[in-house]
């Protein structure tokens, strides 16, 4: 069976696939023009959505496509076909995302960046740090990744609130509500963690009105999608001191232009879309599991609903 592999890390994936499934014929690379000549001979494509979207503009769609990213926004672009099965990466990002969130929550509570700045100025900073114990953390987007983040945070003694597509009981959350209730829940949260996907309903969500409902001094972390935030409104909220800080892993435009105000906004930290890199080993395992399911005409993990966008 021939598999088209469109990935910047194609050599790594090809090696892992050859070791785990030597019967597969892998056609790999990261040059769309070169791959386009082979795409028609491959019923299955594996790779990163930006490269796969480029191939879809040149070639007929495959029978099945496996994304190596959790987000599949490039494949939802206007004019691209949707008459194929698409699965996205699931089950491979939970722990690394939880570690990312925990890193910056603790850094904020313990005033890490403030102490680094003080050291650079030879100032003895003895301001007491905080603790996660007793804090209320709101996770906006409690799918597979959000659930894993919650499980990591629960032992720290936090109270967990969540936003999902439907209100439901979902341990370890004390409450899970719908997006319509977000303004009410942010008023109760000491820390707000955004993990929402890119859908029409999540664009410009964090605007001046919503940011104005945040608890004074709250920390905002966005590792979902940059389009969820109205940039100018977040800058204004930070400059006015209404928020305790913001950590942004994602932005509307990446890389962020040098003239963008995020670079110089006080209390804002940029982490360059590094929160949850794909593990090639975990991704290879997921692909092979889905390949078995595909061949057996069984349900596959991470199947995308094109209407919902995830």
PLM features per residue range, with description:
Residues 1-44:
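N-terminal glycine-/charge-rich "phosphate-binding" loop or analogous flexible N-terminal tail
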Residues 36-40, 56-59, 132, 183-187, ...:
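A short, aliphatic-rich alpha-helical micro-motif
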Residues 41-116:
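Phosphate/diphosphate ligand-binding glycine-rich loop within oxidoreductases
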Residues 114-148, 175:
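Glycine-rich NAD(P)-binding loop of Rossmann-like domains
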Residues 87-100, 114-115, 254-310:
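C-terminal helix-to-coil terminal segments
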Residues 95, 147, 208:
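Residues forming the Rossmann-fold NAD(P)(H) cofactor-binding site
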Residues 155-172:
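NAD(P)-binding Rossmann-fold cofactor-contacting core
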Residues 167-261:
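Rossmann-like adenosine-cofactor binding region
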């Amino acid at each position: 069976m021939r598999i088209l592999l469109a990935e910047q890390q194609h050599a790594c994936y090809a090696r892992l696939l050859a070791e785990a499934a030597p019967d597969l014929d892998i056609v790999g690379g990261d040059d769309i023009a070169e791959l386009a000549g082979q795409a028609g001979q491959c019923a299955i494509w594996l790779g990163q959505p930006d490269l796969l979207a480029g191939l879809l503009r040149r070639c007929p769609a495959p029978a099945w496509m496996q994304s190596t990213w959790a987000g599949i926004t490039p494949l939802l672009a206007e004019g691209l076909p949707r008459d194929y099965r698409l699965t996205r990466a699931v089950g491979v990002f939970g722990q690394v995302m939880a570690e990312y969130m925990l890193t910056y929550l603790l850094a904020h509570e313990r005033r890490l960046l403030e102490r680094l700045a003080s050291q650079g100025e030879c100032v003895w900073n003895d301001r007491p740090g905080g603790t996660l114990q007793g804090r209320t953390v709101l996770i906006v987007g409690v799918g597979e990744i959000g659930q894993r983040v919650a499980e990591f945070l629960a032992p720290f003694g936090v109270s967990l609130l969540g936003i999902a597509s439907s209100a439901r009981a979902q341990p370890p959350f004390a409450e899970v509500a719908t997006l319509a209730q977000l303004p009410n829940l942010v008023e109760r949260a000491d820390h707000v963690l955004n993990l929402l996907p890119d859908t029409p309903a999540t664009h410009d969500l964090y605007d001046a009105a919503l940011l104005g409902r945040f608890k004074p001094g709250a920390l905002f972390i966005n590792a979902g999608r940059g389009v969820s935030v109205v940039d100018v409104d977040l800058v204004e909220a930070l400059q006015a001191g209404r928020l305790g800080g913001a950590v942004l892993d994602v932005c509307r435009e990446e890389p962020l232009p040098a003239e963008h105000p995020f670079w110089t906004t006080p209390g804002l930290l940029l982490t360059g879309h590094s929160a949850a890199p794909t593990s090639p080993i975990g991704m290879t395992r997921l692909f092979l599991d889905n390949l078995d399911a595909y061949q057996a005409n069984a349900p596959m993990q991470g199947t995308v609903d094109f209407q919902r966008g995830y």
